[in-house]
Amino acid sequence: MKNTKQAIALASAAALSVGMLAGCGGAASSAATASSESNSTATAEASTTAASDGTLVLAETGFESKFSPFFAASAADQDVIDLTQIALLGADRKGEMVLNGIEGETREYNGTDYTYHGPADCVVTENADGTVTYDIKLREDLKFSDGEPVTIDDVIFSMYVFLDPTYDGSVTMYSTPIVGLDEYRSSMTTLSKLIAEAGEDNTDNTNFTAEQQKAFWDAVNDGGVKFAQEIIDYCVENGAAADANDAAGAASAWNLGELPAGATAKDMFELIGANYDWNFSSMEAETAGSKLSDLIPEDVYAYSTTGVNVGDAVASVAGIVKTGDYSMTLTTTELSTTMIYQLQMPIAPLHYYGDESLYDYDNNSFGFVKGDLSGVRAKTSAPMGAGMFTFSKYSDGVVYLDANPSYYDGAPKVAHVNMKETQEADKITGVQAGTIDISDPSYSLEVADQIADINGAEGEDGPVITTRLKDYRGYGYIALSAKNVNVGGDPSSQASKDLRKAIMT
């Protein structure tokens, strides 16, 4: 902990701390130590050992304990992943991709030159037939934190996880036009989708058993109906539906789509399922209270991540080709503005997240059985990667990280990082008290005044707290409580709706 100035960031703690955590060679994807007085890039010899002591404490909000490079969902969990993993390609301070990471690229930002290094080079070639080829070459000195080398097999394994038909994490590489990807994914679907689309009265059990069908529809009729009814009840309470039987009105208000008059809660749940291809994890986004995973049996919930071959099986993606131990090509059917950004994907260790006995590139086996990511999903409590820091433990709301001496761009200057789950009310006072080094409170005029008061009326930058404001790409809205703003105590009446509309316009 520092005893003098602390820093408070109005952005993600990990994002602000990258430069502070980097070794002399720089940060994960923006490696530089720049002179503040000239446009020349300062150079320094990268250290191979971390600082002998020193702990940086970062305030975080809302750990979900899904510390996986494939399935992290919350911002706090993703911050842990960002510090323990390396991305195949990185970006500069303007968000532009760095394609020559091995030798590095020097780019100007706000009058200062910065040199960016990364794990790989990428050459993009637009071909005469309209296809686009990405030639990727890895550095040959990369190591995971356990000392194992990073090779192109780890990259290919990671890609196939992201492209698996049952993958339901936040990375959307499966939406890119990679040659052969549609055929690879469409040759398999999920068990939940098959049963749902067959219907409750189905008698053809070619792809699933009668017992599985019954278990699925029992879950829909019980937990699924309860899940949908909570949405309807919420809409009624807030004046967006007429009564507890108004599934059609609630579906419209919830932006689920149209249902006919007289539709039921079960109809609403089936509409939600269709909207999300019957992926129960994705359907959780529509909750009005309860988790769907708490309402339906665990084995049925797993149907949405269980792959079933339909038609002729396609074992590999034609556009992904290994060309060497440290090189590969990826080909798309057309120029895609998003493809290059998808290559910011983490390089996860095959030997840790996958099954090495199931990796045989020449025989279309990529570290797991297609359609079965259960082994990958099981590794969420302790991430492993080749990033700046190694995961030590998660205990009592704190993630403990240690400097990775094998980090390719030099060991971090800070020996330890503690990522501490912190309530919003404590994000400023924690910095003031010295229990937190870097925080990210929600900004407001009241917060600005509080910081200025702590700094002795010296403003947002003072002897106690240093503030850095970061642009936040988001949106805000103003909401009215239908329970409080209505006519005659009837939130759902047309007069009440007209009143709220008049106030907002």
Locations of regions flagged by a protein language model:
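Bacterial Sec-dependent N-terminal signal peptides
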Residues: M1-A11
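Extracytoplasmic/periplasmic ligand-capture domains
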Residues: N3-T4, I136-D168, G224, T306-V308, ...
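Hydrophobic core
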Residues: L16-M20
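Bacterial lipoprotein signal-peptidase II cleavage site
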Residues: L21-S35
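N-terminal lobe/hinge region of extracytoplasmic solute-binding protein
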Residues: A59-D129, M384
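Short, solvent-exposed loop/turn elements at domain surfaces
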Residues: E64-F71, G90, E96-L99, S145-D146, ...
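Gly/Pro-rich hinge or "lid" segments in bacterial periplasmic/extracellular proteins
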Residues: R93-E96, D277, S281-A318, G324-S327, ...
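Aromatic- and charge-enriched surface segment that lines or borders ligand/interaction sites
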Residues: D113, A120-L292, T329, G430, ...
